[in-house]
Design a protein with these regions (language model features):
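PRPP-associated nucleotide enzymes
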Residues: 1-197
Length: 197
């Protein structure tokens, strides 16, 4: 299946839910493209929220998407880092396709042992991402994977974590980018968005 066919098929899974989770927001469900909690004033009603979970009702599309991403980065990266929680859905599949390690980027307090952390500002407060010390090594080229790019805060924190280890962010891959929010402007590395709204 070519890229345009894949994009078209995934795009058809998007569902819109007016006034969800609050009045004035249009929630679009993609059966797995993200249930992101953003405050209403940061989103235009046209953008709404995106949910990638419906995509998982079509396992062949999930596999095709992950193979597409793996082919784009073959021989260019050494490791895939997935952001909690939905980066865990795509990242391991991409890493398996490439035969390279996957590292989970977890929220604070969920990893045992020595950790490295980076904080970031969310719409409703501060949050922290962590990786275990030794999970990434200096010089490794890393693909950071998440389902959605909105304001860029979580991906920026993940970039900071990778940088602290001495590894390099090769690119950030997201299934969906909410382009009007300009989240890519806060990121130091390339953003590869499969779909942009």
């Amino acid at each position: 299946m070519d890229e345009n066919d894949l994009k078209q098929q995934i795009d058809t899974l998007i569902r819109s839910y007016p006034d969800f989770p609050s009045k004035g927001v249009l929630f679009r469900r993609v059966n797995l493209i993200i249930c992101l909690s953003l405050i209403k004033d940061k989103l235009s009603p046209r953008l709404g929220l995106k949910d990638v979970l419906p995509l998982f009702s079509k396992p062949t599309l999930v596999h095709s998407l992950c193979c597409y991403v793996a082919n784009r980065y073959k021989n260019k990266i050494d490791l895939v880092a997935g952001l909690e929680a939905r980066g865990f859905l795509f990242g391991p599949i991409i890493a398996l396709e490439l035969g390279i390690p996957f590292v989970p980027v977890r929220k604070q307090g969920k990893l045992p042992g020595p950790i490295i952390s980076a904080s970031y500002q969310k719409e409703y407060g501060k949050d922290v991402f962590e990786v275990q010390q030794g999970a990434l090594s200096a010089g490794q080229r890393v693909l950071i994977v998440d389902d959605l790019l909105a304001t860029g805060g979580s991906l920026h924190a993940a970039e900071q974590l990778v940088k602290q280890t001495g590894a390099t962010v090769y690119a950030n891959f997201v299934v969906i980018e909410l382009g009007d929010l300009n989240g890519r402007k806060v990121l130091a590395s390339e953003v590869d968005a499969f779909l942009t709204y």
